[in-house]
């Protein structure tokens, strides 16, 4: 039986990804691999991660670190001290890998499931319409929601500046605003602080591998989880 395997934020942790796939006995001929975004950055092997995911025919959605990489390639972003993307940008197959990465959408759907990197605004009634057809190279407020959302108010307004926790009243974790609102289960990542999220209609998979936590998978068909510990902490909080 085909399994849909959703993977939390990998962020260049290729070794942990390979170990998790071994634990899952992943078979690319029958299983569908769907990362939640942030394929790259902060971890030790972003280049190897992209090559592996591409070779396995992975799907997935774009995250904020993926957008940062694409913008850096266009010369629109400067590298930050914590970035680990130089190896990707210097690779002979960089353009091929980034073309593959750029083709990831901001939302994917299956019957009963939404996949998005960060979250969905509580103001949205049709997330697919809000996020379909957006160009990752053109700034759009809905892209910020899909790739950066953590806290918001009940109208979906994000705090400015984006502090964690935010200053000011009315802000709550976005998923508390939308819990039970959609008939679909929302699979997401991006925010390691809450850890594994398993609530009604919510599966949050960012368990902080790059920070020394774990890399986590959710198997949709039987609603089970699998994870492996990080070999070490790759990036400071």
Please identify what each model-predicted range represents.
Residues 1-52, 56:
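N-terminal active-site segment of His-dependent metallophosphoesterases
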Residues 9, 38, 53, 63-64, ...:
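Divalent metal-coordination and catalytic microenvironments
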Residues 4-11, 113-119, 203-205:
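Active-site-proximal beta-strand elements of phosphoester/diester hydrolases
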